[in-house]
């Protein structure tokens, strides 16, 4: 049974991030139903991310001090219930409340989830985080497809399925968590026995280099969250597809991550996380620029090119996912929960603060022009990656 504990945490991650992916996938429906502007749609994303972004580091800090792994179950339950309620509300204001609560659930889940997976990984933390990331990538990949299929066929009430899944996995986690923690303690002891010299060294926090990593996280987060929010709208408004095809495009974007997040973890273990982070940004930067130019191409090649670029961006995001988490936890070895709250939670949410700004620019000019403003963030991230140092050389 013990060997399945990491997969149980990963399953919880999948359900939690499935809930986070519902709102962007259904933005075209909400825009139509409530007559929203793109700026208002952006504020829905902001509601889903702002409070969560503020809570992530705080909850991570509390996690380091108090160690409450059952928050993994509580966070998943809150996200799932809030997502289900989106199918039953009748106003834009109610949607804002549900979106906010779903974001809070995410902020509760991620620090403790990443912290326990770090311990369960033992000496192969990149692989462990790659496994954990599969859950998140699967959730973001299939959540939009599932939500779109429900909302555009049987109706928005079908979102209650997310609540049912959340209740089941949260109950199982709550009951098994004492055993999972005991198993993690056994792994900690085994690692200390195998590496007594490393275990004897006092843990240190390298805030300077974590700050540089945080700049990279911001550059990635801004791009990731805006793409996540507006890809369905980009497909329907700029490329002339149906809403279902817009949801499918979002699924394609995240599907590539299911495999590549795991590969990124393995590559990080082999070559070091810094090299993989730099490679990610080198791929992401030109791909983001090219995506904004797709509507200018002929209809014959427009859609194939759009999907190809989307896959490249998905690859770039996915391979850096685990290395960013592991590097952050290594730089802040004394504060793994806090580091996880920044690298995993905030990296998925804080970029949503920019979504209303991009939405406003899209209303004023065009969506491709608004998305072009994301490219400078990646340039800053790439430059910052050149300033990172291997944690082994800092000891």
Please name every model-derived segment:
Residues 273-324:
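C-terminal transmembrane helical hairpin of 12-TM major facilitator-type secondary transporters
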Residues 23-24, 208-254:
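Extracytoplasmic gate region of multi-pass secondary transporters
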Residues 123, 132-179:
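Helix-loop-helix hairpin linking two adjacent transmembrane segments in secondary transporters
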């Amino acid at each position: 049974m013990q060997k399945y504990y990491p997969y149980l945490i990963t399953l919880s991650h999948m359900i939690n991030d499935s809930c986070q992916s519902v709102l962007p996938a259904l933005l075209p429906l909400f825009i139509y139903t409530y007559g929203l502007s793109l700026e208002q749609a952006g504020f829905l994303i902001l509601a889903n991310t702002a409070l969560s972004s503020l809570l992530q580091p705080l909850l991570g800090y509390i996690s380091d001090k108090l160690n409450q792994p059952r928050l993994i179950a509580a966070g998943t339950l809150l996200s799932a219930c809030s997502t289900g309620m989106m199918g039953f509300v009748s106003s834009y204001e109610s949607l804002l409340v549900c979106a906010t609560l779903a974001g809070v659930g995410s902020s509760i889940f991620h620090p403790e989830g990443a912290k326990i997976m770090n311990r369960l990984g033992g000496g192969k933390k990149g692989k462990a985080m790659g496994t954990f990331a599969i859950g998140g990538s699967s959730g973001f990949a299939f959540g939009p497809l599932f939500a779109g299929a429900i909302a555009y066929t049987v109706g928005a009430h079908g979102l209650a399925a997310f609540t049912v899944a959340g209740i089941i996995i949260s109950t199982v986690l709550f009951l098994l968590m004492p055993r999972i923690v005991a198993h993690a303690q056994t792994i900690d002891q085994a690692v200390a026995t195998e590496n007594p010299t490393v275990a004897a060294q006092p843990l240190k926090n390298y805030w300077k280099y974590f700050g540089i990593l945080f700049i990279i996280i911001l550059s990635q987060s801004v791009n990731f969250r805006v793409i996540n929010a507006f890809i369905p709208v980009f497909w329907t408004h700029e490329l002339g597809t149906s809403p279902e095809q817009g949801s499918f495009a979002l699924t394609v974007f995240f599907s590539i991550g299911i495999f590549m997040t795991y590969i990124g973890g393995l590559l990080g273990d082999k070559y070091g996380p810094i090299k993989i982070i730099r490679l990610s940004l080198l791929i992401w930067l030109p791909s983001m620029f090219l995506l904004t130019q797709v509507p200018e191409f002929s209809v014959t090649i427009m859609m194939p090119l759009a999907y190809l670029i989307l896959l490249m961006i998905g690859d770039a995001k996915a391979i850096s996912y685990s290395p960013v988490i592991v590097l952050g936890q290594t730089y802040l070895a004394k504060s793994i929960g806090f580091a996880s709250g920044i690298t995993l939670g905030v990296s998925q949410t804080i970029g949503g603060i920019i979504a209303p700004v991009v939405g406003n620019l899209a209303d004023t000019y065009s969506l491709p022009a608004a998305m072009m403003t994301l490219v400078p963030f990646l340039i800053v991230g790439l430059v910052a990656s050149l300033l990172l140092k291997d944690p082994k050389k800092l000891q």
